[in-house]
Amino acid sequence: MSDYLSVTALTKYIKYKFDQDPHLQSVLLKGELSNFKKHSSGHLYFNLKDNNSVVNAMMFKAQANKLDFNPKEGDEVLIEARVSVYERQGNYQIYVNKMHLDGIGNLYQKLEALKKELKKQGLFDTKHKKEIPRFPKKIAVLTASTGAAIRDIYSTINSRYPLVEQIQISTLVQGKQAKDDIVNKIKYADTLDADVMIVGRGGGSIEDLWNFNEEEVVRAIFEAKTPVISAVGHETDFTLSDFVADVRAATPTQAAVIATPDQVELSQYIKQTELNLSRHIIQIINNKKKHLEHVASYYKFKQPSLLYDQQIQKKDDFERQLNLSITTKLNNALQKVELLTNRINLKDLKQQTLQGIQSRLQLHDSLNKSIINIIDNSKKRLSQRIENLNSLSPSNTMLRGYTIVNKNEQVITSTQSLEKNDEINLQMKDGTVDAIVKKVRCNHNE
């Protein structure tokens, strides 16, 4: 009995053989749809037949949603599928991945071959994609002069960003002459110094959209220096122009949205930016004001003499050190002269004495001149420093009639800091005055 297989075991073995056969994983079939049914789940169940044979088939919802037509009983179709076994009934059947109406199969093969070649050449590489400007000044629109596409694009641009200049370039999008016209219009638009170019049309069959799969059109988009937005057909339509363009839009309306900012959002952004700038400027002004008040309250500005008292003392110390140094050098020189004088032979005493006296006189004159020059230069530098300090001195300002107002030991710089009956202190050039505010008058222009 162990040599006998169950029906289930046999069916599983046959299914295993089917699933392991690479020739059955992707087969291309053509035939007629019969017994066609669409389940409530979205899956499709049908038979594919020709004059001599029939095979069961099904297509899952995920693949069925990608169809570019609505299949029906009697349609002649081209199918890509895998072959397997439905274990419950023991029947082999096909699981369909792709399905197209027969008659355009050659177009799809041509499309896939060209797509593969252009991809190999790098035309679809991300590194070639140009950025779409955020705030375009000029937009070139290449599409038919009539139809829903141009209306959708213009109405969307006008509602979102009416400031932009729109250049309509009427273009053939269907027919035998459309390919060359699209290429020429792309090259022309590329000379207009536009910020972005929209190339597209409304939806249609694969034959209607085929001009946007032509190699010449694809290369024209690739070679354009102007950023290109492709907007061909509906969301489920894909052409080679979509792959080579800098951005692919699902519809002409979406292309207009991608190409333009929203004026409402821009207005809100500008208002928020203005508010942020105002807050930042006010914060800077307040910080500077606090810093100025802090500096004005610094004790050296309350007692201006502190700014230059130490400099005067340093000058006096320098003069004392200089005089001491000169005196020391002079005494050393005189000692050397006396020492040399004592060594002079008696017979040359008179001559040496005269020469020594003359040298001492010359040395004395030279030292006096040096001392005078050093003292004069020091006085000039000191005078310049005192003059600079006086120009900054509040005391010097008070000599011209100005007064420093203090309240609670804080310098008052504005009438807004005072109120009636406030006790204040007025610091003048020769003393201080205590006073009480009777009335405050504010200059409202500041």
Swiss-Prot record:
Signal peptide annotation = none
- The EC category is hydrolase
Q: What does UniProt give as GO cellular component? A: cytoplasm; exodeoxyribonuclease VII complex
Question: Which family is this sequence assigned to?
Answer: Belongs to the XseA family.
Q: Which UniProt keywords apply?
A: Cytoplasm, Exonuclease, Hydrolase, Nuclease
> Where is it mainly found?
cytoplasm
A biological process from GO: DNA catabolic process
Q: Which reaction does it catalyse?
A: Exonucleolytic cleavage in either 5'- to 3'- or 3'- to 5'-direction to yield nucleoside 5'-phosphates
What organism is recorded for this protein?
Answer: Staphylococcus carnosus (strain TM300)
Keyword flag Cytoplasm: yes
Entry's Gene Ontology molecular function annotations: exodeoxyribonuclease VII activity; nucleic acid binding
Give the function comment from the record: Bidirectionally degrades single-stranded DNA into large acid-insoluble oligonucleotides, which are then degraded further into small acid-soluble oligonucleotides.
- What is this protein identified as? Exodeoxyribonuclease 7 large subunit
Write down the InterPro entries for this protein, in alphabetical order: Exonuc_VII_L (IPR003753), Exonuc_VII_lsu_C (IPR020579), OB-fold_nuc-bd_dom (IPR025824)
Q: Name one Pfam family in it.
A: tRNA_anti_2
According to the record's subunit comment, the protein's assembly and interactions are: Heterooligomer composed of large and small subunits.
Q: List the NCBIfam families.
A: xseA
Q: Which HAMAP family match?
A: Exonuc_7_L
Q: Does the keyword Nucleus apply?
A: no
Enzyme nomenclature, EC number:
3.1.11.6
